[in-house]
Amino acid sequence: MSNSTGKKRIAVIAGDGIGKETMPEGVRVMEAAASKFGIDLAFDHFDFSSWDYYEKHGQMMPDNWKDLVGGHDAIYFGAVGWPEKIADHVSLWGSLLLFRREFDQYVNLRPARLMPGIIAPVVRRDGSAREPGEIDMYIVRENTEGEYSSIGGRMFPGTEREIVMQETVMSRIGVDRVLKFAFELARSRPEKHLTSATKSNGIAITMPYWDERVAEMAKSYPDVKVDKFHIDILTAHFVQRPDFFDVVVASNLFGDILSDLGPACTGTIGIAPSANLNPDRLFPSLFEPVHGSAPDIAGRNIANPIGQVWCGAMMLDFLGHRDAHDAVLQAIEKVLDPRSGAPRTGDIGGTASTTDVGRAIAAAL
């Protein structure tokens, strides 16, 4: 949908809660990067996918939302959800999950990297602290089918005969395309190491099929080392030896779990980024921080904007500007380095505001 030349149109959706505070800082840094590297970015702001919009209109997004954002090169997203006002399944299925499915964003990509100035809660076996960069992995999650299907139902509700069923859906095209993305990513990295998450010893139909497709895909990538772990022991390995992993690929549910656990092992989810990708570039991809809307701290200008900035860097990379991505990431690392004396938000031991940190990263560029 886009190449590295020409104007890039970005649909900006701040959403709910702290998204309204982190998004301006993300845009600030993206504008600084665009200026530095000569990238022509145009930001179009939208107020839907939020409680405020739902309160006014009775739905999370307008009926013509696809027309409004479908022609953009990317979607830059803040956060969605306000559980005290609207049920999560309403806000998510009415916005974020619609983007993922209607725009066929079949890859959810999350880096988990130990950054300077962040103390990892998982130490080495000898009890010593891990160094920046010692944990450096990507979690690749299948994002449009799998366990998160809407196929199923409820029978005889409220009676002793009540039955609830929900089906896992795996298609060959759905599994193969996310595996291909993961193998290509692993091949591009120095370690060339891919780990598959499974549970074929307990889930007797879909997970053996997943394993079969991994084995078949591996034949086309003889240069990539492949291993697999059942999800229960894999979560233990994430905690005990996170430095072992390079690229981890998983189904929708397992990937959802691992892609939160991975960043948590690096010290804080507050700075973690995420991308919902349509690698075929037929539709815009969506870039969002891992953190939620955090209504408990919304409106106080204390949220950490680094996750928002980092996912913006991923957006620049996907749009063909790897140099800008690298520069933004280096600016984040510089601000996080305790030796820099740069401002830090309260979640990582500082007292600075959201705005202070955003300005510091932009200045570091």
Model-identified regions with their sequence ranges:
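Short glycine-rich or small-residue beta-strand-to-loop segments that form or flank ligand, phosphate
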Residues: R9-I18, Y76-G81, L194-S200, W310-D317
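Glycine-rich phosphate/diphosphate-binding loop of Rossmann-like nucleotide-binding domains
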Residues: A11-R28, A33-A34, T159-D232
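Buried hydrophobic positions in well-ordered alpha/beta secondary-structure cores of metabolic enzymes
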Residues: D16-G19, D73, V140, A182, ...
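Buried hydrophobic packing segments
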Residues: G26, M30, V214, Q308-L316, ...
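N-terminal beta-loop-helix "entrance" segment that forms/cooperates
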Residues: G38-P62, F238
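N-terminal glycine-rich phosphate/adenylate-binding segment common to multiple enzyme folds
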Residues: Y53-M165, L253
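Glycine-rich phosphate/nucleotide-binding loop
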Residues: Y54, F238-S340
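Glycine-rich phosphate/pyrophosphate-binding loop and the adjoining helix
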Residues: G71, T144-E145, S150-S196, S200-A204, ...
